[in-house]
Amino acid sequence: MASSFWKGVVGIGLFALAHAAFSAAQHRSYMRLTEKENETLPIDIVLQTLLSFVITCYGIVHISGEFKDMDASSELKNKTFDTLRNHPSFYLFNHRGRVLFRTPEQEPSTPNAQALPSNPLRLRKLENFH
């Protein structure tokens, strides 16, 4: 859990960033009124923007916690080889293998099934087993 100090730093940084944005918008509207549209932002607004951005990023880095290693071996060393690529949600038991490798004793005895021509692919696969 992040300490309240770093959350306060992020809050102050965001507040300063919002203040810099408001100051830049106010300066731009002032420049339009005085018809000096080609002027750049004053250095204090630019510095406040950059400093508040750095403070906010620094606080967020401390709030985020520990970073993970980029090396995958540190995370994979706790897993066995069997569980490495094991995805049980992709298991499918209702597939065409039951129909392709059915023995003649298991053929359905319905008149509809006998009226259909036999599957040549299934017969070729069964011939290889005999």
From Swiss-Prot:
InterPro entries given in the database record: MMgT
What UniProt keywords are attached to this protein's entry?
Endoplasmic reticulum, Endosome, Golgi apparatus, Magnesium, Membrane, Transmembrane, Transmembrane helix, Transport
Q: Which residues lie on this side of the membrane: Lumenal?
A: 23-43
Task: Quote the cellular component terms of the Gene Ontology held in the record.
Answer: early endosome; early endosome membrane; EMC complex; endoplasmic reticulum membrane; Golgi apparatus; Golgi membrane; membrane; plasma membrane
Pfam families according to UniProt: MMgT
Outline what the protein does.
Part of the endoplasmic reticulum membrane protein complex (EMC) that enables the energy-independent insertion into endoplasmic reticulum membranes of newly synthesized membrane proteins. Preferentially accommodates proteins with transmembrane domains that are weakly hydrophobic or contain destabilizing features such as charged and aromatic residues. Involved in the cotranslational insertion of multi-pass membrane proteins in which stop-transfer membrane-anchor sequences become ER membrane spanning helices.
Q: What is this protein called?
A: ER membrane protein complex subunit 5
Q: Which organism is it from?
A: Danio rerio (Zebrafish)
